[in-house]
Curated annotation (Swiss-Prot):
Cofactor section: NAD(+)
GO cellular component, one term: cytosol
Family assignment from sequence similarity: Belongs to the NAD(P)-dependent epimerase/dehydratase family.
EC annotation from Swiss-Prot or TrEMBL: 5.1.3.2
GO biological process, one term: galactose metabolic process
Protein name stated in the entry: UDP-glucose 4-epimerase GEPI42
Amino acid sequence: MVSSRMASGETILVTGGAGFIGSHTVVQLLKQGFHVSIIDNLYNSVIDAVHRVRLLVGPLLSSNLHFHHGDLRNIHDLDILFSKTKFDAVIHFAGLKGVGESVLNPSNYYDNNLVATINLFQVMSKFNCKKLVISSSATVYGQPDQIPCVEDSNLHAMNPYGRSKLFVEEVARDIQRAEAEWRIILLRYFNPVGAHESGQIGEDPRGLPNNLMPYIQQVAVARLPELNIYGHDYPTKDGTAIRDYIHVMDLADGHIAALRKLFTTDNIGCTAYNLGTGRGTSVLEMVAAFEKASGKKIPIKMCPRRPGDATAVYASTEKAEKELGWKAKYGVEEMCRDQWKWASNNPWGYQGKH
């Protein structure tokens, strides 16, 4: 488990900290005694999430949180931020996430995910801040050679989103090889779901959700008429695809474990870790678990497979357990319970129905 030892007041920059995973991680950072600055362009998030974080942690810890509206693609925004504050490390969440959208608009994904990260590296290097946790993705494995996915598997992303994450990883590896003082951890998430147990913060995508759980939740609160399930003829027990769903609070704790590793390990280099549960759950199993948690029936519509979707993807978690001292503690039941608490408290997200 993640150490409960308080931090000694290190100052952390969290890019994309108003987003889904970022906001939950900021809560945990503040509770662990870190000082936090967020930079976010609010393209796919809202400032209300930051306000809710402040309410959750209370006025004392909230005084250690600062928000900056800025865009990593504008290197000047980063320059100003780093010239005003000395950061001990950076957690980099900022970016776009959506497989289908990336196929339709690849240049936007490479701009937001790759160019922005290169800008971040340049400014961090200029100000001699060389400890970095990067948000990567299980999509770098593509159709995996083996299940569960292990960190040293061959990487062959199958779409522009996955490739943008893979290229970020390659840039990180190259920079660390060139400048040995960098300490970089790449966290490959599987499928983040759930919400803070308070029901005050959660995932609030703009437009039609790209991912299963926010889609299910919007059907449950009658924002959408039915759930489209893409592919019901996979070679699995119920014909639907299998994924490794992980509670966002487990993910948040994984980032703190990674941060502590950066502060305590000199020769970490650039190392990748899977953050998942190690257990595969089918789409229909997830629907059934959400129906049980919410008491709502989810109407479904079976649709053809989407090109590039893998049959089954789940994580080997041994490396993170051994080297980070981190292990997911929440199961599917808790994921659905907390997702429903968020959805039922906020059926139209942070800003209500417009």
